[in-house]
A protein has these predicted regions:
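Conserved alpha/beta-domain cores
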Residues: 1-203, 209-211, 223
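Gly/Pro- and small hydrophobic-enriched strand-loop and loop-to-helix capping segments
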Residues: 213-230
């Protein structure tokens, strides 16, 4: 299939999943994950109307941003972020979805103050017990939100999570449910609005939609099999 056909197919799958879940498809957006694909693929997706793209690696985001040189693109960082990469995130990214510790929040705040800008962020929540998964333990999130509330440079929009890597649908669904309930709890107890739930990828987005996801991070279903990582 062409890229346009793949995008259309995924959009239809999302529409049907929303229908089954009794949700408005307008409440769920697709975030194309362009990691490991070249900037020409991003350019093709832009021709289809896409302007937001997610990257795991800061260096790859920077390379594509420089190659494309288009200020209309919104780059979203979704991978684990080392504090020594904060400068590049502040320069090139419009959103960070992997805020998972106070040290990183402090480093971001310092750089953002120097740059005179704000950054949309999502707190990454660890919703399973897999050692390979990163993110903040759910029980630590409420206090973390209170702590960083004074950081005017960080615009906390909601939560992101990666569900357990398993074929058991119920275990995947519970990961998403856990994060949605945590979001609801934080909104109720802290009187704040956290509209974004970035949950669900190519293999599990239908379950994420059932549990209230507002943003799906879709890569291979849109772009095809990933090329080898350089």
């Amino acid at each position: 299939m062409s890229l346009a056909e793949q995008f259309a197919a995924v959009n239809e799958q999302v529409r049907l999943a929303c229908e089954r879940a009794g949700r408005d498809p307008q409440q769920v957006c697709i975030l194309p994950v362009s990691k490991t694909f070249g900037h020409e693929v991003v350019r093709q997706a832009m021709a289809l109307g896409q302007r937001q793209f997610a990257e795991n690696r800061v260096q790859e985001m920077k390379e594509k941003a420089l190659a494309l040189n288009d200020s209309s693109i919104e780059w979203v960082v979704i991978g684990y972020l080392q504090t020594n990469k904060v400068k590049e995130v502040v320069r090139y990214a419009s959103q960070l979805q992997s805020l998972d510790r106070l040290e990183l929040a402090q480093a971001l705040d310092k750089r953002l103050q120097q740059a005179g800008r704000r950054l949309d962020v999502l707190v990454q929540v660890k919703s399973s017990n897999e050692e390979s998964k990163t993110g903040m333990a759910p029980e630590l999130v409420p206090q973390f939100l209170k702590t960083i509330r004074d950081y005017d440079t960080l615009n906390v929009k909601g939560f992101m999570t990666v569900a357990e890597n398993t074929h058991e649908q119920e275990r995947i669904r519970r990961c998403f449910e856990r994060v949605r309930q945590l979001r609801d709890q934080c909104q109720d107890e802290q009187g704040r609005t956290l509209p974004v739930l970035s949950m669900g990828m190519s293999a599990d987005f239908a379950l994420a939609i059932q549990e209230g996801s507002t943003q799906l991070r879709i890569g291979s279903a849109l772009f095809g099999q990933r090329p080898p990582v350089r």
